[in-house]
A protein has these predicted regions:
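Alpha/beta-hydrolase fold nucleophile elbow
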Residues: 81
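Conserved G/P- and acidic residue-centered "switch" motifs that form tight phosphate/ATP-binding loops
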Residues: 45, 88
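Short, surface-exposed ligand- or partner-binding patches at beta-edge/loop junctions that are enriched
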Residues: 84
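Rhodanese-like catalytic fold shared by cysteine-dependent sulfurtransferases
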Residues: 1-31, 37-41, 49-78, 92-124
């Protein structure tokens, strides 16, 4: 019985850690700070095409998380990369992938994702 409690406690600690851990290679920015920097960077929307077409930040390129492996060479290493998705989960995954596979150093994400965005959007 004690063994089960230890396993349960291990799972709880793991999920709490995953929830609140902030990767050192990714900077999470408020909308105000995101707007200040993304015009001088590569702005990448990692949502799926249907989500992107429903509305996206003006100037963003759509490279869905599902296509990132095939299209990662479209992202330059020598410029900052500003990422966003609907809520933040996919942008974190994309940042981890770009850091590991492409060696991208300058990575930023929109805090709260597109659902928290109140700035200008473009719809197709």
């Amino acid at each position: 019985m004690e063994f089960l409690w230890i396993i349960l406690l291990g799972f709880v600690v793991y999920f709490v850690f995953k929830r609140f851990y902030k990767p050192k290679y990714l900077t999470s920015l408020s909308q105000e700070d995101f707007v200040k920097g993304y015009r001088k960077a590569q702005l990448i929307d990692v949502r799926e095409p249907r989500e992107y077409e429903g509305g996206h930040i003006l100037g963003a390129r759509n490279i869905p998380m599902s296509q990132l492996r095939q299209r990662m060479n479209e992202i330059r290493n020598d410029q900052p990369v500003y990422l966003y998705c609907q809520s933040g989960a996919r942008s974190k995954q994309a940042a981890q992938f770009l850091k590991k596979k492409r060696g991208v150093e300058d990575l930023y994400e929109l805090q709260g994702g597109f659902k928290k965005w109140t700035g200008k959007i473009k719809k197709k």
